[in-house]
Amino acid sequence: MATMAAEPVFVDTNVLVYAHVAEAPWHQEAQEAIADHEAAGAPLWISRQVLREYMVSLTRPQQFPIPPELTTVVAQVQQFQQRFHVANEGPEVTTRLLALLLEVPTRGRRIHDANIVATMLVYGVRRLLTNNTDDFVRFAAFIEVIPLVPPPASEPPPSA
């Protein structure tokens, strides 16, 4: 009997940062989520955009009380390129991004999110692991958003 391979998962920048910075919120959750998808055999994807955003986040002085050394960040990015499938942003991604912007009107910094979705679509990845679920709700017709931290259960209504 043949088994189906787990569907690929795209890892958003915030999850990558949380997983690799011990002081970050949701550090343990991010590490476990990545490990769980790996254990299930899901190919894990990132993009060149995610690599750039990771470097920006970790080297911004105001981000962490003691920012990591640049050599550490560079070494981590080199490791990510070995550990994850890395999607390149060629002309196909730009073409898909432009079409996506017309399908789901998006402006300003949200275009970065649209670019991630366009990259995913070009590479056939339909699942996104992120802690910024609200940023991707508008693209629900195209991708499945997997929340890093499930939303809290709604509180029961007060009794009368």
Listing of model-derived features with the role each one plays in the protein:
Residues M1-I46, Q62-A75, R138-F139, A153-A160:
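Short, well-structured N-terminal submotif of metal-dependent ribonuclease cores
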Residues T3, H85-N131:
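Active-site neighborhoods of divalent-metal-dependent phosphate/nucleic-acid chemistry enzymes
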Residues V15, V50, V93, N115-I116, ...:
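Alpha-helix capping/helix-boundary segments
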Residues D36-H37, F80, L100, V104:
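Hydrophobic helix-cap positions at the C-terminus of alpha-helices
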Residues A40-G41, F80-R83, F142:
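Structured helix-beta-strand junction loops
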Residues W45-R48, T130:
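Short beta-strand segments at enzyme active-site cores
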Residues V56-N88:
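Helix-adjacent hinge/juxtasegments
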